[in-house]
Amino acid sequence: MKLSFTKMHGAGNDFVVLDGYSRALPPLTEAQVRALANRHFGIGADQLLLVEKPTVDGADFKYRIFNCDGGEVEHCGNGARCFVKFVSDRGLTDKRSVRVQVMKGLITLTLQDNGEVVVDMGAPVFAPAQVPFDVSGLDGRAEGRDTLWPLDVGGATRWISAVSMGNPHAVQVVDDVEAYPVLEEGPLIERHARFPQRVNAGFMQIVSRHEVKLRVYERGAGETLACGTGACAAVAAGIRRGLLDSPVTVHTHGGTLTIGWDGARDEAAALMMAGPAATVFEGEIDLTA
């Protein structure tokens, strides 16, 4: 079967986008997702994004995300920015702001005149059971309004903030993110037994109260050039710990994101993420190949 696709990226976090809205697509198997995402034998991407008709009231579209390992996941902020650019460029909507159904609710995406996209990422969740994160037997320590948790990583203790942005994140502050062994520790944290659904591992360097550098080892994808939910989780943890003030500029290997959160006043406030979205190319691929 010939499959039309669009290759996009948001700050270097790259995606294969499929239009299941204009016409229904057959369900993709995990093996087919892995084949499409393969950088040597397929198109190549961190994630595959599927645009569909919504199944709940109040939504304009449904947005599904599949990691390059074939598994479906809850949320992807960089992908959300590409999503709204895709539906706008394809003429699927004439709205500048759309409501989109994701696995755990609705999000609002707004395409600005300068081409950047603002995403209402929702409120962060810090309750360990809702991340989910097993803290049984652990002694946390308070820092600001946050609780840091000790995590055994390869025999060393790492103090993390556990945050859900609709998907699970473990955030730690490091002195030098470029020198830090992200590729060694990332997979150990991602698959740590205390995270039953695995976890995205974030490594944040504080530059100033309004600026950080961030690397994220993503669940099911490895280290990516940028991670939108990871940026939001890191900023929320930093503000809650008293280390950062909103808005925060987040520098990733793929580009820069701006995160705003009024969490110092109201932890139920939504995080707002602004950043780029770009189309790289379009094409067709034979799924049977």
Swiss-Prot record:
Q: Where in the cell is it found?
A: Cytoplasm
GO CC annotation: what is one? cytosol
PROSITE patterns, per database record: DAP_EPIMERASE
Cysteine pairs bridged by disulfides in the record: none
* Record key words, sorted: Amino-acid biosynthesis, Cytoplasm, Isomerase, Lysine biosynthesis
* Annotated site (Could be important to modulate the pK values of the two catalytic cysteine residues): 169, 218
Give this protein's Gene Ontology molecular function annotations: diaminopimelate epimerase activity
**Main location per the UniProt record:** cytoplasm
Residues of the active site are 76 (proton donor), 227 (proton acceptor)
Q: Name one GO biological process term.
A: lysine biosynthetic process via diaminopimelate
The UniProt catalytic activity note for this protein reads: (2S,6S)-2,6-diaminopimelate = meso-2,6-diaminopimelate
Q: Name one Pfam family in it.
A: DAP_epimerase
Instruction: Specify which residues bind substrate according to the UniProt entry for this protein.
Output: 13, 47, 67, 77-78, 167, 200, 218-219, 228-229
Name the EC number(s): 5.1.1.7
The pathway it acts in is:
Amino-acid biosynthesis; L-lysine biosynthesis via DAP pathway; DL-2,6-diaminopimelate from LL-2,6-diaminopimelate: step 1/1
Record's PANTHER family? DIAMINOPIMELATE EPIMERASE, DIAMINOPIMELATE EPIMERASE, CHLOROPLASTIC
Family to which the UniProt record says this protein belongs: Belongs to the diaminopimelate epimerase family.
What is the annotated role of this protein in its UniProt record? Answer: Catalyzes the stereoinversion of LL-2,6-diaminopimelate (L,L-DAP) to meso-diaminopimelate (meso-DAP), a precursor of L-lysine and an essential component of the bacterial peptidoglycan.
Question: How does the annotation summarize its subunit structure?
Answer: Homodimer.
| Name this protein carries in UniProt | Diaminopimelate epimerase
Gene that this sequence comes from: dapF
